[in-house]
Amino acid sequence: MLYQDEKGPVAAKTHGGPSWCSVQTKIEKAQKIKGLLNVFGVYDHTNDQMYTHSYKNKKGDQFLDFIKRIDRKYGSSVKQIFLVLDNASIHRSKKVREIIQKHHHRINFVFLPTRSPELNLIEVRWLWMQRQAVNNSTFRNESDIGKAISDWTYNYNEKHGRRITDILQIGVMSMTT
């Protein structure tokens, strides 16, 4: 079971950071946005891994491209993929439904109730990513954002993948002794 969601747009802008001033002084700093990026992601709770891909837009065509990537990623090793997602219009469009039924018949959508993001396990990971990779960071352009998110995803998977491996090794060792 995979938990899917989109994050964004994430803006490439300069964060001024903290500054000191008297209480009544107002600091105005114009921030120029140098680009926007939308991130599509899935969280696989069976192995505690994330997969993300960035796009300039957040529309049905990008969602379908992301679904194709997920389908290829899991290959023939998985017979059925259950994708838990929210009720965004890009998930429910007629075009998306037709293409999924025609070309990706092993992918099944499981829609969450309206206004219930807490049921989507990827939401917590988005919060972690926002805090660790995006907040208080300076990005020159979209590729900087994409690299920061890609690096965060890689580091998340390395850290959590190792943890799962360690748990499995401990389980095997305890069974043999």
Regions found by a protein language model. Give the residues of each.
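Mobile genetic element proteins and their domesticated derivatives, centered on retroelements
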Residues: 3-5, 42, 48, 67, ...
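Conserved nucleotide-binding/hydrolysis micro-motifs of P-loop NTPases
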Residues: 7-9, 46, 89-90, 116-118
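Acidic/histidine-rich, metal-coordinating catalytic segments
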Residues: 78-91, 120
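Short, basic/hydrophobic alpha-helical segments
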Residues: 62-82
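Extended, low-complexity cationic-aromatic segments
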Residues: 1-68, 169, 176-177
